[in-house]
């Protein structure tokens, strides 16, 4: 049962509130809390000069600022602390604050708790953004007033009073956001699971545990959608508290969605033929099947079909850039894990020239090497993980007794130049890093945009 937002308004008024992080996504939250009558202090590691005009803007509305390297040392004495998702709750500063009586939460937890609209939550290792967007587009096509947020779109908590019971909200949720969650969306999906973010999570078990929070607090009339082709997610059916629908690319599924004789079906009803889908790759057929399961109760087959046959994809996801001298360039900068890169490689009909490497999330690259060695013509590596990926591939090349040229480069510009020089007419060059971007870029979008700019200048 959803709580009325008036309870939160009564609770937060006059409270001493700390908001950790003054990034773009937290700024609407800070301003909203001030509007609700809270006494807000905003914390950030950056100094005033780095933050720019936002520091003055916040001070003008009465927000106190705690800035600099040791900013978390001053979390004592607050009634409520809104933490940024990527910060672990077991940090000593948070543990101490909680022991002193602080209520530690996050924007997303409070949003799901009080949102009057029906909430669709999507998580998983790969396919989250595309599936979130597909669900959003299908609901919108059906005529619902639909909001999208979480890891994509805009922060929604500040707009909660505009939302109605007959609205729909679609959220992409990361393991970081879910780790401390004690509330679940009414309709939840786990797309798939593979090792990821092990630079933040203690181990893979903790990562999986965090993902399960998306359905752990559901009720009997809620829905959980699971991937039947993924052993980990398929086995979660036994832990479900409500209804379960499954999707599969390889098995017939009657209580869910599947690919049968090249037809995409939901509950035995045909939606469309796979040849009519604009999205590239089998992994995107899986994303569509998952979306069908989520919206089945609310959306007509016609609306599902329209989106499935017209939606051409989200930027930075197997995105075709251009063809130059018979060479095709694709931007798959979203691929920040080996499994996502492997899915991208599988969407091409021939071996490609792959540009990969980046920030080290402490995840193994052996599965990428073993599953992808025969799908790569030339491997161009950059970033912190370049030698780690090279080592994984060299082992596979050695015992498979196959050949693959591996080139180490120091920049995106050099990577594209090398790829372009080595490519022949008919080749495909794709940026699909298998790693996060943080060693060289603030995010995957900026990484992808630089790649596109370089390719477009060829």
Swiss-Prot record:
Cellular location(s): Cytoplasm
Entry binding sites for ATP: 124-130
EC number annotated for this UniProt entry: 6.3.2.9
Keywords: ATP-binding, Cell cycle, Cell division, Cell shape, Cell wall biogenesis/degradation, Cytoplasm, Ligase, Nucleotide-binding, Peptidoglycan synthesis
Domain of life: Bacteria
Pfam families assigned to the protein according to its UniProt record, in alphabetical order: Mur_ligase_C, Mur_ligase_M, MurD-like_N
Coiled coil among keywords: no
GO biological process: cell division; cell wall organization; peptidoglycan biosynthetic process; regulation of cell shape
GO terms under cellular component: cytoplasm
Family matches, as Gene3D superfamilies: Mur ligase, C-terminal domain, Mur-like, catalytic domain, NAD(P)-binding Rossmann-like Domain
Catalytic activity line of the entry: UDP-N-acetyl-alpha-D-muramoyl-L-alanine + D-glutamate + ATP = UDP-N-acetyl-alpha-D-muramoyl-L-alanyl-D-glutamate + ADP + phosphate + H(+)
Pathway: Cell wall biogenesis; peptidoglycan biosynthesis
Enzyme kind, highest EC tier: ligase
MF (Gene Ontology): ATP binding; UDP-N-acetylmuramoylalanine-D-glutamate ligase activity
Family: Belongs to the MurCDEF family.
Record function comment: Cell wall formation. Catalyzes the addition of glutamate to the nucleotide precursor UDP-N-acetylmuramoyl-L-alanine (UMA).
Protein's recorded name: UDP-N-acetylmuramoylalanine--D-glutamate ligase
């Amino acid at each position: 049962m959803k709580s009325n937002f008036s309870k939160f308004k009564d609770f937060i008024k006059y409270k001493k509130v700390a908001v950790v992080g003054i990034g773009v996504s937290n700024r609407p939250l800070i301003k909203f809390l001030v509007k609700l009558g809270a006494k807000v202090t905003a914390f950030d590691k950056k100094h005033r000069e780095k933050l720019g005009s936002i520091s003055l803007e916040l001070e003008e509305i009465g927000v106190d600022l705690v800035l600099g390297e040791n900013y978390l040392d001053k979390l004592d004495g607050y009634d409520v602390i809104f933490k940024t998702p990527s910060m672990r709750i077991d940090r000593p500063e948070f543990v101490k604050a909680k022991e002193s009586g602080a209520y530690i939460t996050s924007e997303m937890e409070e949003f799901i708790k009080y949102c009057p609209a029906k909430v669709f939550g999507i998580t998983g290792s790969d396919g989250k953004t595309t599936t979130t967007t597909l669900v959003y587009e299908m609901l919108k096509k059906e005529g619902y007033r639909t909001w999208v947020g979480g890891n994509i779109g805009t922060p929604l908590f500040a707009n909660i009073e505009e939302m109605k019971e007959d609205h729909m909200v679609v959220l992409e949720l990361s393991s970081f956001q879910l780790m401390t969650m004690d509330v679940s969306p009414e309709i939840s999906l786990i797309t798939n699971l593979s090792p990821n973010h092990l630079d933040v999570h203690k181990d893979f078990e903790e990562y999986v545990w965090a993902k399960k929070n998306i359905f752990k607090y559901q009720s009997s009339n809620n829905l959980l959608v699971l991937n039947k082709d993924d052993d980990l997610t398929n086995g979660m059916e036994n832990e479900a508290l409500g209804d379960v629908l499954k999707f599969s690319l390889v098995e017939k599924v009657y209580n869910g969605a599947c690919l049968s004789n090249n037809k995409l079906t939901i509950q035995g009803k045909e939606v469309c033929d796979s040849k009519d889908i604009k999205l590239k790759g089998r992994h995107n057929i899986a994303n569509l099947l998952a979306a069908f399961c989520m919206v089945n109760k609310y959306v007509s087959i016609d609306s599902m079909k329209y989106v499935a046959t017209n939606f051409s994809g989200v930027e930075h996801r197997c995105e075709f850039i251009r063809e130059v001298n018979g060479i095709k360039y694709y931007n798959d900068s979203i691929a920040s894990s080996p499994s996502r890169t492997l899915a991208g490689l599988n969407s091409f009909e021939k071996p490609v020239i792959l540009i990969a490497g980046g920030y080290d999330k402490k995840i193994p690259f052996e599965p990428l090497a073993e599953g992808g060695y025969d799908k790569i013509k030339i491997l161009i590596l950059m970033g912190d993980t370049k030698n780690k990926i090279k080592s994984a591939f060299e082992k596979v090349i050695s015992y498979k007794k196959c050949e693959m040229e591996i080139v180490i480069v120091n920049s995106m510009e050099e990577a594209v130049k090398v790829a372009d020089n080595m490519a022949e007419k008919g080749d495909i060059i794709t940026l699909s890093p298998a790693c996060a971007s943080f060693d060289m870029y603030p995010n995957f979008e900026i990484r992808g945009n630089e790649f596109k700019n370089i390719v477009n200048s060829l």
